[in-house]
Amino acid sequence: MSKYTVLVVGMGKRGMHHATTFNANPKFKVTGICDIDAARLDAAAAKLGNPQKGADAAGLAKALKPDVFCFCTLPNLRLPMIRAALEAGAKLIAFEKPVALTSAEVFALRDPIRQAGAKAVVSHQHRYGKHYQKVKEIIASGALGRVHTVYGSATGWMTHMLSHLIDYTCWFNNYAPGVWAMAQAAGKS
């Protein structure tokens, strides 16, 4: 069985975690890594079996033509990373939340991915926490009856924590369509 080839861009803590996890799965092989910090890139390469490496994500992607393009970068780099992935022919693009910084950017990302026939996966790792899985199990068992109202709150950077709240609220309820929603924000604009 041939393995899916993976390029991971951004070798900080999260990128290193993704690369290590891909390599631990027998279906994947990290064939390239990318970071603009040369020392961090060298350290990551040594830990990952010395895959090809570089500081130019688009150039490395074009050279490697990975099946999977995974990036763990700042949110303002979403569109250039997705373009690089698609131009290299990647069929799966994996990245961290938030999906985008504006609703217009969501569509600017979504449309070229769809047109290329690729798939995108946004990491919501809270689903793998035992306490979140237990809540999902309890709700699915019917022990609480029909869920008809969900309340939630988040603090801190809205695109960081609120996206988790929205994700697992939808997940807990099998993506039942929302009927009504209300949101409020306070503080500096």
Segments (PLM) and residue ranges:
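Rossmann-like dinucleotide-binding domain that binds NAD(P)(H)
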Residues: V147-S189
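Rossmann-fold dehydrogenase core element
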Residues: A108-H126, G145-V150
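N-terminal Rossmann-like dinucleotide-binding module
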Residues: M1-L48
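Nucleotide donor/acceptor-binding cores
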Residues: S2-Y4, K91, A118, V147-H148
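Rossmann-like NAD(P)H-binding beta-loop-alpha module
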Residues: K130-T149
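Short histidine/acidic/glycine/proline-rich micro-motifs that form metal-
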Residues: V99-A100, H126, A154-T159
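Beta-loop-alpha module in the N-terminal Rossmann-like domain of NAD(P)-dependent dehydrogenases
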Residues: H18, L48-P112
